[in-house]
Structure formats: structure tokens, C-alpha cells
């Protein structure tokens, strides 16, 4: 594993503030550093939601315009269901990460899709009335 138990504990038990240096590429987070002694790694695939840890140890959550490859170690990925919620956060706002399983993430994504479908049907009925 690239990160020890201390890094995981820090990530999930700390508040992080979205930096003013954030944009659609990534949300730079201010808070406790996670300690990246690895520096750069060979380039590997990245995706929106990946949380990479550059040399300073401060997490960056990759967002919609994130590069498709990069060389920083990645500690986690924001659930696809939660990524739109994170995208609505503004610089200066606090966030906190919570570890969930892949199954929990999949259930949340299905709930979101169902909610969107329900809203779409209600809006469609409303426009016909």
C-alpha cells in the first residue's frame, strides 16, 4: 500500500477547506498533510473524483476537467454519486471524507439515478398540465 493507517485516519478524521486555487481541473484542499514520501510515480490513469497526494501532502480532488494521466499517488476516489455535490462546493467551504465500500457507492449511484428519473417524470407531468 502507498499510504499507511495514519494517512487514512488523517484523511477521514480531518476537515479540509477548498482552496481559492481550485478550479474545474482539481480542488486543492487545505488541512492536515498526508505525508507523501513517494513524490512522483510513473504516469497512470486518473479520473474525476480521484484524490491525489502531491509532494506537499495536501490532497487534490480531481474534477471535471482533470487530466487523464498523472504521476501523483492516489489515496481514494470520491463516489460518482457524490461528485456533483463536491462540484457545488465553493472555495473556503469545508469538506470531510468518509470511507465507503464499492457496494455502498453503487447503491448511492442507483438512488441518485432513480431520484433524477422521478424528478424528470414530475417535471414532464407539470409541463403538460
Region roles according to the model:
Residues 1-129:
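Conserved "landmark" site that anchors the functional core of diverse proteins
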Amino acid at each position: 500500500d502507498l499510504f499507511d493507517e495514519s494517512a487514512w485516519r488523517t484523511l477521514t478524521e480531518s476537515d479540509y477547506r477548498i482552496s481559492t486555487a481550485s478550479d474545474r481541473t482539481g480542488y486543492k484542499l487545505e488541512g492536515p498533510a498526508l505525508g507523501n514520501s513517494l513524490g512522483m510515480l510513473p504516469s497512470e490513469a486518473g479520473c474525476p473524483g480521484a484524490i491525489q497526494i502531491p509532494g506537499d501532502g495536501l490532497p487534490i480532488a480531481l474534477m471535471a476537467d482533470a487530466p487523464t494521466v498523472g504521476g501523483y499517488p492516489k489515496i481514494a476516489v470520491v463516489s460518482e454519486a457524490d461528485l456533483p455535490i463536491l462540484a457545488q462546493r465553493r472555495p473556503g467551504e469545508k469538506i470531510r471524507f468518509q470511507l465507503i465500500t464499492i457496494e455502498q457507492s453503487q447503491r448511492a449511484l442507483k438512488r441518485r439515478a432513480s431520484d433524477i428519473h422521478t424528478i424528470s417524470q414530475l417535471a414532464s407531468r407539470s409541463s403538460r398540465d
